[in-house]
Design a protein with these regions (language model features):
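Class I S-adenosyl-L-methionine-dependent methyltransferase catalytic core
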Residues: 1-187
């Protein structure tokens, strides 16, 4: 019996068209291509030499898209070991291990201070219905993870009341699609 596979694609840049295969599970929601296109248009595709943090990496789709579009470095944080192994295979296949680091841990309990690094762009696409959006913003502030004028992308469940999020970041873009809403904040 063949193993079921699912995939998502890198949609632009050096690795445009590359498939990222993964074993599907109900907690995994790779960011849709249309959503990625909107996000990177919001950023004006200006990722050249930027450092990125993909806090709930999953398949790594957002961080890989950033590398494909010129980001200098991406750190992926993912709690599921199987997804980390899958992401390692993708990095090797694309020969970009030197631009990426994978940390297999729960992003919410990780001590980000050991990275001694700030990021130009932080991707937040936490599991839905676990109340992780506010905690994620709190961690960004607590560990001072964002450079001045950096960006935070948040993808969340459609019914999350974004007005209740406490953050010093300014919401500059918003859209929605399917079961998700997504936002771009500026630091």
């Amino acid at each position: 019996m063949a193993k079921r596979q699912a995939s998502t694609n890198i949609i632009a840049g050096d690795f445009k068209g590359t498939k990222i295969n993964f074993k599907p599970n109900k907690s995994l929601r790779p960011t849709e291509s249309k959503t990625k296109e909107t996000l990177f248009n919001w950023l004006l595709n200006d990722l050249d030499q930027k450092t990125c943090l993909d806090m709930f990496a999953g398949t790594g789709a957002l961080g890989l898209e950033a590398i494909s579009r010129g980001a200098k470095k991406v750190i992926f944080v993912e709690r599921q070991k199987r997804l980390c192994r899958n992401l390692e295979e993708v990095l090797k296949k694309l020969k970009i291990e030197n631009k990426c680091k994978i940390i297999n841990t729960n992003a919410i309990s990780f001590d980000f201070s050991i990275l001694k690094e700030k990021f130009d762009l932080i991707f937040l696409d936490p599991p839905f219905r676990e109340n992780l959006s506010q905690r994620s913003f709190d961690m960004i502030n607590e560990y001072d993870l964002l450079v001045e004028d950096g960006f935070v992308y948040l993808e969340c469940e459609r019914d999350l009341d974004i007005q209740k999020l406490k953050t010093s970041f300014v919401k500059i873009k918003a859209s929605e699609g399917g079961e998700s809403k997504y936002y771009l904040f500026k630091g």
